[in-house]
């Protein structure tokens, strides 16, 4: 039993040394400035931070976030179905989905879902 632990330790040590040597030998001498800079959604981090930002992109993001939270609220309703009255569950679900559909209709009617504007 003790010999198995020693053999596993030696294999681990050899593997670690080989990986360390491979990483040292494979490094490039010149590190590219663009490759080492952080990437943030296509924005250049080295330029001015006061660039114009698309309000439409921001609003689409907020709409997505709202509907994503609403989906997270809908999913537990299936689990609640086992423990609650079917009539109360149905009425609650219909009201919740109607509120979602009214919100979606309002966003559509206001033109927030049209990307071409």
Swiss-Prot record:
It is found in: Mitochondrion membrane. InterPro entries: NADH_UbQ/plastoQ_OxRdtase_su3, NDAH_ubi_oxred_su3_sf. Its main location: mitochondrion. The keyword Metal-binding does not apply. The chain crosses the membrane at residues 4-24, 60-80, 86-106. Gene3D superfamilies: NADH:ubiquinone/plastoquinone oxidoreductase, chain 3 (1.20.58.1610). Pfam families: Oxidored_q4. It is an enzyme of class 7 (translocase). It is a multi-pass membrane protein. The keyword Electron transport applies. GO terms for cellular component: mitochondrial membrane; respiratory chain complex I. GO terms for molecular function: NADH dehydrogenase (ubiquinone) activity. Keywords: Electron transport, Membrane, Mitochondrion, NAD, Respiratory chain, Translocase, Transmembrane, Transmembrane helix, Transport, Ubiquinone. It comes from the Eukaryota. Belongs to the complex I subunit 3 family. Core subunit of the mitochondrial membrane respiratory chain NADH dehydrogenase (Complex I) that is believed to belong to the minimal assembly required for catalysis. Complex I functions in the transfer of electrons from NADH to the respiratory chain. The immediate electron acceptor for the enzyme is believed to be ubiquinone. This is NADH-ubiquinone oxidoreductase chain 3.
